[in-house]
């Protein structure tokens, strides 16, 4: 009896560990990825530090990345501006911001095998931007029905 109880507890523990592993390994939704890659609420980041977070999801050094110094909620509001065709010439779900925001552009200067050792040049600017927006996925927070999924361009 004691052995069976121990075995069942061990199986339960293993099952719980497997479930937790699967949950923690889930990929972010497109809007969560957008938030990770492009929203930086603080003032200008050091690109070497900020890009470690971005690169963690692919395990590789991203060549170029732009951080918008604004909130996710502010970018969601841009999704309600009039739609236009995206830079690819086919997607009709892009929207221009109404005002300029501070941005930080990170350009790869030294690639490394380990993404945590990549080096970037940091450039700051004030730019307007265009984002592509889609309906939220079931895994997104229900707060916003439409969410940004791609930073299309700066202007």
From Swiss-Prot:
Catalytic activity: an [RNA] containing cytidine + H2O = an [RNA]-3'-cytidine-3'-phosphate + a 5'-hydroxy-ribonucleotide-3'-[RNA]; an [RNA] containing uridine + H2O = an [RNA]-3'-uridine-3'-phosphate + a 5'-hydroxy-ribonucleotide-3'-[RNA]
Pfam families in alphabetical order: RnaseA
Catalytic residues (positions): 38, 150
Keyword DNA repair: no
Residues given in the record as substrate binding sites: 62-66
Signal peptide: 1-25
Species per Swiss-Prot/TrEMBL record: Mus musculus
Homology family: Belongs to the pancreatic ribonuclease family.
Residues bearing carbohydrate: 114
Protein EC: 4.6.1.18
Functional summary from the UniProt entry: This is a non-secretory ribonuclease. It is a pyrimidine specific nuclease with a slight preference for U. Cytotoxin and helminthotoxin. Possesses a wide variety of biological activities.
CDD domains recorded: RNase_A_canonical (cd06265)
GO MF term set: lyase activity; nucleic acid binding; ribonuclease A activity
The entry's keywords: Disulfide bond, Endonuclease, Glycoprotein, Hydrolase, Lyase, Nitration, Nuclease, Signal
Keyword Signal assigned: yes
Protein name as it appears in the record: Ribonuclease 2B
UniProt xrefs under PROSITE patterns: RNASE_PANCREATIC
Coiled coil: none
Top-level EC class: lyase
Superkingdom to which the source organism belongs: Eukaryota
